[in-house]
Amino acid sequence: MQIQIVCVGKIKDAYISSGVVEFEKRLRPYGKIFITELAEVKIPDNASASDELRVKEREGELILANVKEGFFKIALDPNGMSLSSEEFSDVFRDAKLSGKNLCFIIGGPLGLSPKLLQSVEKKLSLSRMTFTHPMTRLILLEQVYRAFRILNGEPYHK
């Protein structure tokens, strides 16, 4: 199974970068994990609502252009479904059984465009709380790792 994470913005904090590297290393035995990091579209100073929508639309176009062909798209969105870690592991089990590869999408600071959200197969919320987008990447990788441990009946802290 292949798992792509498409995200807008670079990680600037060393502690987040080291966490991401650690989980990428831990995930190697379970499948090919790759991260596609895209540059943020500049938000104009004193941006209007229509300016912000244009930024989200442009980022959405960039994201969709970088999703690997045929991958099952899951957008991280505050209004998406909330899953337990066990339920999240079912997403991977189902994908594996159906021969699908997964692509998780993390937007920029303004979020994801309505057009992109309409184009994905699933919307997932990691929490009702707000996280920075780099932190979201780290939390997602940890949950992906946890999901594989659950699927394989391997121990992991609860």
Curated annotation (Swiss-Prot):
Highest taxon in the source lineage: Archaea
Single GO MF annotation: rRNA (pseudouridine-N3-)-methyltransferase activity
Organism, as annotated: Methanocorpusculum labreanum (strain ATCC 43576 / DSM 4855 / Z)
Name of this chain's protein: Putative ribosomal RNA large subunit methyltransferase H
Reactions catalysed, as given in the entry: pseudouridine(1915) in 23S rRNA + S-adenosyl-L-methionine = N(3)-methylpseudouridine(1915) in 23S rRNA + S-adenosyl-L-homocysteine + H(+)
Keyword Methyltransferase: yes
Reported function: Specifically methylates the pseudouridine at position 1915 (m3Psi1915) in 23S rRNA.
NCBIfam families: PRK00103.1-3
Positions in coiled-coil regions: none
Keyword hit for Cell cycle: no
Subcellular location: Cytoplasm
